[in-house]
C-alpha cells in the first residue's frame, strides 16, 4: 500500500460535497474554526486541523450548505 494515499479519498469526499471548490471551502472554513478554538466534532488520531475537518466531512458531521 502506498503511504502517500489520502484517506479518505478525494473521490469519496466529492460524493458528499459535490465539487472540488465546495470541498476546499468547506474543509478550510472548518479547519479555521478548529484553529480558532472550536472543539473537533469527532475523535481522530491527528491533531492537524485540516485532517480533522476532512474526517468530519467524510463522516457527514460537517456539510456544505449553499
From Swiss-Prot:
EC number(s) recorded for this UniProt protein: 2.7.7.6
InterPro entries named among the record's database cross-references: DNA-dir_RNA_pol_omega (IPR003716), Pol_omega/Rpo6/RPB6 (IPR006110), RPB6/omega-like_sf (IPR036161)
Gene: rpoZ
Biological source species: Clostridium botulinum (strain Alaska E43 / Type E3)
Biological process terms in GO annotation: DNA-templated transcription
Entry similarity comment: Belongs to the RNA polymerase subunit omega family.
Catalytic activity: RNA(n) + a ribonucleoside 5'-triphosphate = RNA(n+1) + diphosphate
Role: Promotes RNA polymerase assembly. Latches the N- and C-terminal regions of the beta' subunit thereby facilitating its interaction with the beta and alpha subunits.
Pfam families per record: RNA_pol_Rpb6 (PF01192)
Protein's name according to its UniProt entry: DNA-directed RNA polymerase subunit omega
